[in-house]
From Swiss-Prot:
Organism: Babesia bovis
InterPro entries registered for this protein in UniProt: HAD-like_sf, HAD-SF_hydro_IIB, HAD_sf, PMM, PMM_cap
Recorded catalytic activity of this chain's protein: alpha-D-mannose 1-phosphate = D-mannose 6-phosphate
Free-text function comment from the UniProt entry: Involved in the synthesis of the GDP-mannose and dolichol-phosphate-mannose required for a number of critical mannosyl transfer reactions.
Transmembrane parts of this sequence: none
Sites where the protein binds Mg(2+): D9, D11, D207
CDD domains referenced in this protein's UniProt entry, alphabetically: HAD_PMM
GO molecular function: metal ion binding; phosphomannomutase activity
The protein's name in its UniProt record: Phosphomannomutase
UniProt keyword list: Cytoplasm, Isomerase, Magnesium, Metal-binding
Compartments, record wording: Cytoplasm
Protein family per UniProt: Belongs to the eukaryotic PMM family.
Any one of the GO CC terms: cytosol
Catalytic site positions: D9, D11
Amino acid sequence: MVRQMLIFDMDGTLTDPVQVINNDVKDILRRCKRKNFEIAVVSGSKYEKIKGQLNDGFIDEFDYVFSENGTQVYVKNVLVKSLDITEAIPETKLRKMVEFCLRYIADLDIPTKRGTFIEHRKSLINICPPGRNCSMVDRRRFVEYDSIHHVRQKLIQVLKSQFDSDDCPLSFVAGGQISIDVYPKAWSKSIALSHIGKCDVIHFFGDNTREGGNDFEIYNHPDVIGHTVTGYKDLVNQLEELLAKS
């Protein structure tokens, strides 16, 4: 039997940003499974956040859950593989980067600052100029402001010039709507592909597929058929087309 897999980004793809999964998405994913597609989700978020968005136990219907870009691998709620950023980047470099970002954000003139500007996850550093504690209203204000003033892209360029190096190559990418993710260059979302074994056909669906976005590498991987989506409704439409051809 041909082994086929569908891999999905979370925010902006399976769900609206930081919202729970819609029943229409659940229904079509179940139809995909009945057509013998395996399904997986890969997100920069922590596992607990992914689990909360895939509510009512729906996470159990995924064959793989790849949190933190695929460096934390879960199969049926069991962690089977984990990478730690502190084992890949020297502590002195991590500390200097965090201190630099806090000073940089302190001097930013942006609509709101709400706290939790730096989040140290197991395998990546999440930098959030408005703060991860921001409300949905705050989030929308920053998204609009960032689309005009390019706050994140400017910070990304500064971080690249300050902290990327040949001896410790790092990726600095736009994550979701309001953040920047920092991780070793080899730990993009495409690392998830190394955990699924031999697969005949792999489709990836994501919204942040442009260069500089955190879906770019897996979307452009030679073993992957990449699909750019504009939201969960567009995802449903694209999956309907895929099922019609299956």
